[in-house]
C-alpha cells in the first residue's frame, strides 16, 4: 500500500508544509485557563520547599531510583501523582495560539491540524500488575496534559533537589508548545491471555492484520501493547515528549520500536496546500477533513452501537512503515510515474483533468493506477483519515536510502477501511514495484480525556 490521492491512500509520503493554519481542534473542549507554573518553559518562581521535596521523592520512587526511593515507598504511593500533576490549575497558559487543547471528546492528534514533525513509539508493558498499568496511564495523562500546554513534567528540569534526578529531562525548556499533540492507543497484545483482566473488553475490530501480498514485515518494527503518537512543529518538542513518557514508564513499560517522521504526507485542514510525498507527488488531496463532522462520524469515530462501550468516541489506528525504492523510482520516466499514480505531477490533477481537486474519471486511468485502486468508489465508499509522515533513516549496506512513508490512518473499523483497501492495493497497484511494507501495527485509540479526574483508558479499566 502506498500513497493515495484520496482519503484511502495507504502508501504515500509528502514533504512538510508549514503553511497550514492551526485549526480549532475538532470537537475539542477548551483547556481551562491556568495560573503560574513552576516551570512553564522557561522556569518560574520556586514553590515551598516542603512541597517540592514531597514531589521529588514521589518521582524518585516512581522511577525506582535506588534504595532511597524504595525506602520511601509509602510516600511514593501518594506522591507520584503529586509530582507529575504540579497543580495544573495554577499554571500560566503557555504560548497562546500554539497549544492544542488536550482535553476533549476525542483525543487530539486525529482530526486536529497536522504539525510538521512526528515521534511515534510503541511500548511493551513489562509489569504484570494491573494496578501498576493503571497508575502508568494516569501518570502519562497528567504529564501529557502539562507538556501539550508547554509546561515541564513535575518540578521541571532544574530542581528542586540537586541530589535527585529532575522530573523533566529539560531539552524542551524555553521552547513553545509547537502544537504538540499526544495520542495513545492499545494494541491487540494488551488483551491477550487476559494479562490484565481485559480479554472480554477486546473490541471485535481489534484484529490481527492479515498478511498482504508483498509484505516483508520485521518483528522488531511491528506490534506493541501501547502506542504514543507525538506530533509537533518542533521535532525537539516531539522527541522530548516521548522521552519523558518513556522515562515515567520505567519498570512498567519499555519502548519496543519507534519512528521519527517529517514532512507530513496529509493534511486535515481543507484550505491547506496539499503536501508532496517523497516520490514528488501531491498527497492526501481527498483526505477526510478535520472540520467535516459528518464524515468523521461516518468513517473515523467509533460509535456507541459499534461497541465496546469504552471505545465509543475513539478510533482505530493502523501504522505501517513503508520503505520506498527511491533510486529505482528516480530512474523512471515522468510519463510512467504519472500513469502509476493516475495524477499529473506538477498540478496534482487526475488524469484527463486540469485541476487537483477535479473529480477523477477513474476509467481514464490504468486499472493498476494507485488513485483508481484506492478511490472510495472501489471500496463501497470506505474512507480513512490519513496522518502519515515521510522518514529517512540513513542508508543500507548497498548505499541505498532507507526512506519512505510512515503511514498512519484512523478509521471507524479496519475491517471496512484499511484491510479491504490494502488488500486491493497489494494485489494490483503498479506502485508496489517501488515500495515495501516492512513494519505494521494496529491500535484501538480510546476517546479523549474529558477532565482532570479522567485519564487515558479509564473506561476500559473501570
Can you describe what each PLM-predicted range is?
Residues 3-4, 56, 61-82, 86-462:
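Long, histidine/aromatic-enriched segments associated with O2/redox biology
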Residues 1-57:
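N-terminal secretory signal peptides
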Amino acid at each position: 500500500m502506498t500513497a493515495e490521492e484520496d482519503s484511502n491512500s495507504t502508501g504515500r509520503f509528502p514533504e512538510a508544509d508549514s503553511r497550514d493554519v492551526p485549526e480549532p481542534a475538532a470537537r475539542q473542549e477548551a483547556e481551562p485557563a491556568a495560573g503560574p507554573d513552576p516551570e512553564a518553559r522557561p522556569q518560574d518562581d520556586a514553590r515551598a520547599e516542603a512541597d517540592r521535596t514531597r514531589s521529588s521523592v514521589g518521582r524518585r520512587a516512581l522511577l525506582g531510583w535506588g534504595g532511597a526511593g524504595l525506602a520511601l515507598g509509602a510516600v511514593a504511593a501518594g506522591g507520584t501523582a503529586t509530582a507529575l500533576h504540579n497543580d495544573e490549575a495554577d499554571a500560566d497558559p503557555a504560548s497562546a495560539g500554539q497549544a492544542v487543547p488536550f482535553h476533549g471528546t476525542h483525543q487530539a492528534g486525529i482530526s486536529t491540524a497536522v504539525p510538521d514533525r512526528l515521534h511515534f513509539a510503541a511500548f511493551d508493558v513489562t509489569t504484570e500488575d494491573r494496578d501498576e498499568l493503571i497508575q502508568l496511564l494516569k501518570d502519562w495523562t497528567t504529564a501529557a496534559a502539562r507538556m501539550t500546554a508547554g509546561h515541564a513534567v513535575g518540578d521541571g528540569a532544574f530542581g528542586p533537589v540537586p541530589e535527585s534526578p529532575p522530573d523533566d529531562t529539560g531539552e524542551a525548556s524555553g521552547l513553545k508548545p509547537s502544537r504538540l499533540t499526544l495520542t495513545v492507543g492499545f494494541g491487540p497484545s494488551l488483551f491477550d491471555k487476559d494479562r490484565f483482566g481485559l480479554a472480554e473488553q477486546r473490541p471485535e475490530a481489534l484484529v490481527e492484520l492479515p498478511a498482504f501480498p508483498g509484505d516483508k514485515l520485521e518483528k522488531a518494527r511491528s506490534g506493541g501493547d501501547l502506542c504514543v503518537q507525538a506530533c509537533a512543529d518542533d521535532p525537539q518538542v516531539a522527541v522530548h515528549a516521548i522521552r519523558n513518557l518513556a522515562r515515567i514508564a520505567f519498570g512498567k513499560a519499555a519502548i519496543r520500536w519507534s519512528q521519527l517522521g517529517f514532512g507530513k504526507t496529509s493534511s486535515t485542514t481543507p484550505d491547506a496546500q496539499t503536501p508532496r510525498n517523497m516520490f514528488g507527488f501531491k498527497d492526501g488531496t481527498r483526505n477526510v477533513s478535520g472540520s467535516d463532522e459528518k464524515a468523521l462520524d461516518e468513517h473515523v469515530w467509533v460509535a456507541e452501537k459499534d461497541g465496546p462501550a469504552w471505545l465509543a468516541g475513539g478510533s482505530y489506528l493502523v501504522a505501517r512503515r513503508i520503505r520506498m525504492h527511491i533510486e529505482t523510482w528516480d530512474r523512471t520516466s515522468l510519463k510512467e510515474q504519472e500513469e502509476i499514480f493516475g495524477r499529473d505531477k506538477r498540478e496534482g490533477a487526475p488524469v484527463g483533468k486540469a485541476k487537483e481537486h477535479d473529480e477523477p474519471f477513474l476509467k481514464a486511468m490504468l486499472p493498476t493506477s494507485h488513485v483508481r485502486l484506492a478511490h472510495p468508489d472501489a471500496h463501497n465508499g470506505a474512507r480513512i483519515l490519513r496522518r502519515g509522515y515521510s522518514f529517512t533513516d540513513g542508508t543500507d549496506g548497498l548505499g541505498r536510502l532507507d526512506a519512505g512513508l510512515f503511514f498512519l490512518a484512523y478509521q471507524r473499523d479496519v475491517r471496512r477501511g484499511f484491510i479491504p483497501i490494502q488488500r486491493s492495493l497489494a494485489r494490483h497497484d503498479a506502485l508496489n514495484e517501488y515500495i515495501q511494507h516492512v513494519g505494521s501495527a494496529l491500535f484501538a485509540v480510546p476517546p479523549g480525556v474529558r477532565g482532570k479526574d479522567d485519564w487515558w483508558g479509564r473506561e476500559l479499566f473501570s
